[in-house]
Amino acid sequence: MSLQSNQLVLHDDVHPYLLNATLFTDYAHKLRTITIPEGHLVTVNSEGSLNFPVGSIISKTFYYPKADSGVLLADDDGNLFKPDAGTRGGLDLTKVRLVETRLLVHRQSGWVALPYVWNNEQTEATLEATGDIKSLELVHGPERRRFPYIVPDQNQCAGCHGTNTASKSINPIGPKVANLNRNGYDDNQNQLDAWQADGWLELKGN
């Protein structure tokens, strides 16, 4: 990801995706992406979970649509990510407020959770291992309310993604075959089929 002319844009090797089932997070919209190291494949195990190679990065950016006045909106109408903007699509920062980006990075030692928080100027995101609390004001219909938006710390991220309490290892929980089996941002093609055609996903044996 990078910032270009008031757009948060994706690089060529960053793949945005949508899920069939998602969690509610204080009306925040989410831009989800997968980055796979060049020359490697994602495979699928017998349970329908994806096996990501070391060096993979899964990101989730939380943002809110905003009115011309700058007020944040509790708006569930569609996704504001535009696939045809920038290199691989983008978010128009004149229309949205970025709050946080959570990364899962696959290292040789396993997955690591890294929470990043965007500054008020929307110019950079800083790693906040201890989490953060943002005071946000949100308009929902005729109502306006201020609330504490909580960015989880690394331990809380690991707690949600923990799959083995003994080893304390963590794993991705959202991107599974069943949850990804739908059209993506290109509404004319199933995203799993698109990824196979692009040569970085192998579904054999599933």
Residues of each region from the PLM?
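N-terminal pre-domain segments of enzymes
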Residues: 1-34
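Short, well-ordered loop/turn sites that connect or cap secondary structure elements
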Residues: 52-55
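Sequence context surrounding c-type heme c attachment/ligation sites in exported
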Residues: 73-206
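Short, conserved secondary-structure segments in the cores of folded domains
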Residues: 46-48, 160
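Short, structured beta-strand/loop micro-motifs enriched in basic residues and often containing a Trp
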Residues: 31-43
